[in-house]
Every structure is written in C-alpha cells, then in structure tokens.
C-alpha cells in the first residue's frame, strides 16, 4: 500500500458562515472538502436551502482528518450556543 503524501492528503473542513441583513444576523454551520468552492455555492444559491438569497462570509473554519470527525464537530458547533453567540459578538464589534 502506498503512503499518502501531505500534498495528496484529503482534509475535511468544518465551517461557520455569517450573513447580515438590516437588523438580522445569521450563522450557518457545515462541513466540506473544498471550502472555497462551498462558499461560492452558498453565495450562488446552490447551497443549503436555509442559505439561499443571502450574502455569506466565512467566519470560522477548522480542518479534520476524517469525515466522521468533521461531522461530529459540525454537530457540536451547531449545538454549542456559546460558541455561536461569541462569534456574533465578535462580528458586531
């Protein structure tokens, strides 16, 4: 079996997007293998239903080595209100 070199190693990213409209600020959490492409999809209306029709910016990302790890982190971040509240506070300042 050939070893995977760091160049060919696939990483999974967990990310948090932010979008502001008038007096409303929203966040969205997801995971992907191509962060730049995924952000473009969200902004083009091809992303998740809840992200359509908004301009999104990347607020936070982290990489994971496995899909399972990325999915677990996504779940954790989605359910960690303190984390998302902290992000909102940073954006508002």
What are these regions (language model features)?
Residues 1-50, 54, 61, 68-83, ...:
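GIY-YIG nuclease catalytic motif and its immediate N-terminal context
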């Amino acid at each position: 079996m050939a070893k995977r070199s760091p160049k060919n190693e696939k990483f999974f990213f967990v990310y948090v997007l932010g979008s502001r409209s008038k007096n409303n600020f929203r966040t969205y959490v997801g995971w992907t293998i191509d962060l730049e492409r995924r952000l473009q999809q969200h902004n083009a209306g091809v992303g998740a239903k809840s992200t359509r029709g908004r301009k999104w910016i990347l607020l936070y990302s982290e990489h994971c080595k496995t899909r399972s790890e990325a999915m677990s982190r996504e779940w954790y971040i989605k359910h960690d209100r303190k984390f998302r509240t902290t992000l909102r506070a940073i954006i508002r300042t």
